Regions:
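C-terminal helical cap(s) of enzyme catalytic domains, especially alpha/beta-barrels
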Residues: 266-280
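Short, acidic/polar
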Residues: 15-26, 90-99, 198-206
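Active-site acidic/histidine proton-transfer and metal-coordination neighborhood
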Residues: 20-21, 58-59, 63-66, 81-182
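Acidic/histidine-rich catalytic cores of soluble enzymes
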Residues: 4-9, 34, 40, 139-237
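Catalytic domains of carbohydrate-active enzymes, especially glycoside hydrolases
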Residues: 20-40, 106
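Glycine-rich, proline-tolerant flexible connector loops at the mouths of alpha/beta enzymes
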Residues: 37-59, 117-120
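H/E-rich (His + Asp/Glu) clusters that bind or coordinate divalent metals
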Residues: 233-236, 243-257
């Protein structure tokens, strides 16, 4: 019997719509799980991330549970290496709040990228100093996760201090805790310099990160004017065959989360992924 493809989506890719409409749409597209960032989907319920209460978490967690939808990733995408110490401290506090409330949301993994040591893009992100700041911040996050029995999911991001699979492996080796896992987004590993070698880049990620990959983001890209641009799944240049083959045979039942594919393109993108998955 073929292992089914477990597909989900970022809730905020539907925009800011009423909760009942969101759950109805998720059921309509037969998504079994979501990545949920409350500030992006329901900002009125999160005046500040650190002010979230168990009641807020339970309210949304119960609503998704009743609809048969699991929160696979509780999104708290904050800048954990912000240039301003006060901003960095607030980012870590917000993330720790999500770790504390994860179980009330019905989630076990809280996810983020690493951010930027400058305002926006800077080559300073590619320094050893920036990477050491990532280790310092993630160490604090993982210590808190261990207290609450939940997991930190770190995602490599284009032009972030953590932007390659080898750096993600270094992070895992530097923080020897199973409460630290990787959210793998193969599109985020692409750059104008390496996308023509994407088979090699993706194979390296699977080899280096292996069973420390908790969730896989499914996103597509093109290169335009020398820069990576994200496009709906199936409309770009990412080769999904090796990714879906890995999901089907190496990590059966691992959850995939579609990203940067808005509703006008969802049906076509879902059909594309299911077709590729069936054929690999």
């Amino acid at each position: 019997m073929t292992v089914p493809l477990h597909l989900g989506v970022r809730a905020h890719d539907f925009g800011q719509i009423p909760l009942a409409d969101l759950t109805r749409k998720l059921q309509q597209y037969e998504f079994s799980h979501i990545q949920f960032a409350i500030k992006k989907s329901f900002p009125q319920s999160a005046s500040s991330l650190s002010a979230l209460s168990p009641g807020t978490a339970t309210y949304y967690g119960n609503a998704f549970r009743r609809a048969g939808i699991q929160i696979a990733v509780l999104g708290c995408y904050v800048n954990i290496v912000a240039p301003d110490p006060q901003t960095e401290a607030q980012a870590l506090a917000d993330f720790k709040t999500h770790l504390r409330l994860a179980r009330d949301f019905g989630a076990s993994l809280v996810g983020t990228e690493t951010g930027s040591v400058g305002q926006g893009y800077t080559t300073d992100n590619f320094t050893e100093e920036a990477f050491q700041r990532v280790i310092a911040a993630v160490s604090k996050m993982v210590a808190e996760a261990e207290r609450f029995g939940v997991t930190v999911g770190i995602e490599a991001g284009l032009n972030h201090p953590l932007h390659t699979a080898p750096l993600a492996r270094r992070l895992l080796d530097a923080i020897p805790s199973n409460n630290l896992q990787i959210i793998l987004d193969c599109a985020n590993l692409m750059s104008p310099d390496n996308y023509l070698r994407q088979d090699e880049v993706v194979d390296e990620a699977f080899e280096l990160l292996g069973n420390r990959i908790a969730v896989i983001h499914l996103k597509d890209f093109i290169v335009q004017d020398g820069k990576i641009q994200m496009v709906p799944v199936g409309q770009g240049w990412l080769k999904f065959e090796p990714i879906l083959r890995y999901m089907k045979y190496e990590r059966p039942h691992i959850q995939g989360i579609m990203e940067s594919t808005t509703e006008p393109h969802l049906a076509e993108s879902v059909a594309f992924l299911k077709q590729v998955y069936e054929n690999v």
